[in-house]
A protein has these predicted regions:
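Acidic donor-binding loop of glycosyltransferase active sites
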Residues: 261-273, 286
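Membrane-proximal helix-turn-helix segments that form the acceptor-binding/catalytic region
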Residues: 126-158, 166
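Conserved acidic donor-binding segment of nucleotide-sugar-dependent glycosyltransferases
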Residues: 301-303, 307-314, 323-328
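Active-site donor-binding segments of glycosyltransferases and PAPS-dependent sulfotransferases
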Residues: 26-97
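A charged, aromatic-enriched C-terminal amphipathic alpha-helix characteristic of glycosyltransferases
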Residues: 312, 326-357
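Short hydrophobic beta-strand element within catalytic cores of glycosyltransferases
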Residues: 267, 287-292, 300
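Conserved donor-binding/catalytic core segment of Leloir-type glycosyltransferases
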Residues: 186, 190-226
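Nucleotide-activated donor-binding/catalytic signature segment of Leloir-type glycosyltransferases, i.e.
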Residues: 235-257
Length: 364
């Protein structure tokens, strides 16, 4: 059976790439089709797979400039030639699910979320451009919505990373999705060391992560805030932050683990699609404060593994943080919860899905 893997783009090693690497391990040597890649951004789990990029690779400056090319991405992903492949597995948060499978092939899409730019974060995307260009961009995003719905018919089986994303898939595309949470390396993220007295955020410095809300919450709680992550808002956030906020930028896995181990709590003030960092924190024995109705709620049982605030205001999040800080959360219980999202469990569930959806085939 010939298998092709499709991923939106390879410009970092975040949660989506971890999922892709785990899926790729089912199919050693299977080619990966991606719109563009950034040098040095392909992790060890994907290094043995041939990687094919689209024509956009030549105009993204090595994967550094790509968001303005959003209108060109549907055509680029549809241009991948997949003739002769029997199984297509796409890992999609933007356009990868819009690849055109050959006749007779089975297309399984692991959906991290439907395209943010066209749906739940459209208004945020519009605010990032000048008012003069907004009418043009709004019209283009409406076109992208139409394409997004139409191209969903190219998928035979959807897998969602959380109940929240499954609801979006049903609402936007009128399709059902099986929920299989992403794999987390709970063997690496383990408890250790002394618990410290700071709040931790692990997030890209972009508007929808609401880092400015996290800064306000930590100030009200009276604890230092450590922020791990990079992004275009770094300068603005640093300019308005008090001295008790420490921007650590991009860190090694070992440093990330140390931060989880020493934090008083992990704060997730935004609506996460799933949030692998939530599981990583619990695996290290650290409670989590997040939001009800978010993907975080698939991981955190409020009162057992932290607290889920009923809404995302500073006041509600401060109250949740104070409750968590005022009680003990046994590390064993947090660790046990995290182990339910292990790489091994993902492999069992995703492997079982493949067994169910693939027709019986004789080996070539």
């Amino acid at each position: 059976m010939r298998v092709a893997l499709v991923h939106d783009w390879l410009t970092g090693t975040r949660g989506g790439e971890a999922v892709l690497a785990e899926i790729a391990s089912f199919f050693p040597g299977a080619p990966i089709f991606t719109l563009f890649r950034k040098d040095g951004a392909v992790g060890a789990g994907l290094a043995s797979h041939p990687i094919h990029t689209s024509a956009l690779q030549r105009v993204t400056l090595g994967g550094r400039l790509y968001r303005p090319l959003l209108p060109l991405m549907p055509q680029a992903v549809a241009g991948f030639r997949l003739d002769g492949f029997d199984l297509i597995v796409s890992s999609s948060h933007c356009v990868a699910k819009g690849v055109i499978p050959p006749p007779g092939a089975v297309h399984v899409c692991y959906c991290h979320t439907p395209m943010r730019y066209a749906w739940d974060q459209r208004d945020d995307y519009l605010r990032q451009v000048t008012p003069l260009l907004r009418p043009l961009l709004r019209a283009e995003l409406e076109h992208m919505r139409t394409w997004d719905v139409v191209s969903s018919a190219r998928v035979d089986h959807f897998v969602a990373n959380s109940r929240l994303v499954a609801r979006r898939i049903e609402r936007y595309w009128r399709r059902e999705a099986e929920v299989i949470p992403p794999p987390v390396d709970v063997d690496f993220f383990t408890p250790g060391g002394e618990r410290g007295g700071h709040v931790l955020m692990v997030a890209a410095l972009v508007p929808y992560k609401r880092v400015e809300v996290g800064i306000a919450v930590a100030r009200e709680v009276g604890l230092p805030l450590h922020v791990i992550g990079e992004g275009p808002m770094r300068r603005a956030l640093r300019r308005g932050a008090p001295a008790t906020v420490h921007f650590l930028g991009r860190v090694t896995r070992e440093k990330l683990r140390d931060e989880f181990r020493s934090a008083a709590l992990l704060l997730v003030p935004n609506v996460e699609d799933f949030g692998m960092v939530t599981v990583e924190a619990l695996a290290c024995g650290t409670p989590v404060v997040g939001l009800e109705g978010s993907g975080t709620a698939d991981v955190v049982v409020s009162g057992e593994h932290g607290r889920l605030a009923p809404e995302g205001s500073v006041a509600a999040l401060v109250a949740a943080c104070r409750e968590v800080l005022g009680r003990e959360f046994p590390q064993g219980a947090l660790r046990t919860r995290a182990e339910g999202f292990s790489r091994q469990r993902f492999r069992r569930r995703f492997g079982y899905l493949l067994e169910r959806v693939l027709p019986a085939r004789t080996s070539p």
